[in-house]
Curated annotation (Swiss-Prot):
Protein name: Elongation factor G
UniProt similarity note: Belongs to the TRAFAC class translation factor GTPase superfamily. Classic translation factor GTPase family. EF-G/EF-2 subfamily.
Cited HAMAP family: EF_G_EF_2_B (MF_00054_B)
Role, per record: Catalyzes the GTP-dependent ribosomal translocation step during translation elongation. During this step, the ribosome changes from the pre-translocational (PRE) to the post-translocational (POST) state as the newly formed A-site-bound peptidyl-tRNA and P-site-bound deacylated tRNA move to the P and E sites, respectively. Catalyzes the coordinated movement of the two tRNA molecules, the mRNA and conformational changes in the ribosome.
Higher taxonomy: Bacteria, Bacillati, Bacillota, Clostridia, Peptostreptococcales
Amino acid sequence: MPREFPLERTRNIGIMAHIDAGKTTTTERILFYSGTTRKLGETHEGASQMDWMDQEKERGITITSAATTCQWLNHRVNIIDTPGHVDFTVEVERSLRVLDGAVAVFCAKGGVEPQSETVWRQGDKYKVPRMAFVNKMDRQGADFFNVMQMMIDRLAANPVAVQLPIGSEEEFTGIIDLVKMEATIYLDDVGQETKIVEIPEELKELAVEYREKLVEAVSETSEELMMKYLEGEALTEEELVKGIRQGTINVQITPVYCGSAYKNKGVQLLLDGVVAYMPSPLDIPAISGIDADTQEEIERHADDSEPFSALAFKIMADPYVGKLAFFRVYSGTLDAGSYVLNSTKGKKERIGRILQMHANTRAEIPTVYAGDIAAAVGLKDTTTGDTLCDPTDAVILESMVFPEPVISVAIEPKTKAGQEKMGVALQKLAEEDPTFKTYTDEETSQTIIAGMGELHLEIIVDRMMREFKVEATVGKPQVAYKETITKAVEVEAKYAKQSGGRGQYGHVKIRMIPQEPGIGYEFTNSTVGGSIPREYVPAVDQGIQGAMVNGILAGYEVVDFKVELYDGSYHDVDSSEMAFKIAGSMAFKEGMRKASPALLEPYMKVEVVTPEDYMGDVIGDLNSRRGQIEGMESRSGAQVIKAFVPLSEMFGYSTDLRSKTQGRATYSMHFNHYAQVPASISEKIMTGK
């Protein structure tokens, strides 16, 4: 089957936003207008097409990025709906890796909210071209221009209006197109009947002013247009469109649209914009990877004739077909039934069937081409972030880096029979989500689950019950503390057993040096003159790494230190790798005791949005939780407090905040850094463990 849509008519976009900005509703409307859905699903009625997991329908939030494909103006648009809740930032992060562009949805009233900033920064990190959609223009307090200003102040973005709203709140009746300089008026409440008219008299001056701003912003994207602009020549509509497209793709400008997805206003025009201004796979730089054989850097271009390469960006357990691996094809083509190499793991895999997804219905397709997003059935060893490629031309694409979990709870099944089922369920859920870990606590033999926040773990437990029918009881949340050293020391350790028979002998001298927070562990060898033979050096490193899993204060992992192996001795007959491994571990434990060990705890960056009346209470409460207030600002009638607070003090915060502010304040938090625990508190942790 030949390619249905050429590459230049393919768009891979994400829809990203803060919770409740109307992201899922916007995606729904896109699917409706592009003829993919028969009826509209309302998120607040729990019937949305994209939110297809039970928990999502119940909570009205999007948890997993559903990948969907639709058609508009003879283009294929692949859409990834990303979650807006901070516990699921990994979903956003991994979708942004495989997209070519994104539509950021902002609420016309709330504007740039905390999660919008997080998501926007992730977009900056991957240099994703973006356009903005100011949604909910029909809401009380909607203010298009305020949102534009907030994008400049809070996101350091360069928003450029390509549309202006006609009226707002109840009076939102149409949209001005600043490129064509005409207006679309909505004649009914549901946005079905429209009429193109001249720009209303009272808005002409404003439209001319913003058209001028648009032309100026566009002229800065190329020298040719700049010359024309400076000479006072008018830009043609064609030049303007080309300039907006170029500026968007180069991440110089962010075109801003407006509308009300719920009332069906502005969505078709937004789709026109996606086709006109979002990049095709040909517009973005080639993806670079490492040649699996030579280890040299190579590039893969969006071209069907190049060797096949793809990135698996999501694994999902599907009740009907088993394990589904969503992947983005960067180069080449792939047929169902063929073999690929998972170059990350060095394993060959057979692709059973290839499915193109629409929220949670699917169509089987025989072939995928460069630039496509699809899901494969039959991949056993593939996990998130793995590269799939042509077995005869192996490449490893840059993988994704996921944050470590910061919160853990003990979990046990309510019945004996549930034990095995729970093991299977947790393993499947961990395969899907790289930020979710599960392990057995060696001391207590309890099963521990760890993740990015309380909501994250709640949803895991919920899914176990719904999808795997395992009921479980959950313990109190535990914080992932770490240990470190605070001063440099030199230690030596000798492991010798030489009484009769084959002996053991290993002798090491090491320096342990504290590192900057977040650096992790580093090992260097500076021995000279063969005092320790080369083949035993890795064993010393292994011994230290084995011992650092359990620190001496409270048994937590030891981080942020450097070990220099600078001397030692060996025995021709009795030395072995094992002996040096044990000597390394003994030296580490001795060094740890001498190096003034300290406990570290995770600090969260917390942002609370509260009405002014409760500000004193909220700040007082954060201080009592050992919070460090970082700053305050006012935002559309509310006060925003930013602080760093230890995670251990944040359990149950949402309930406390609700009662302190009568439910009027909201907060978001995400992991920021590890810092030393004050002595008085570390005492409690050590005795309480």
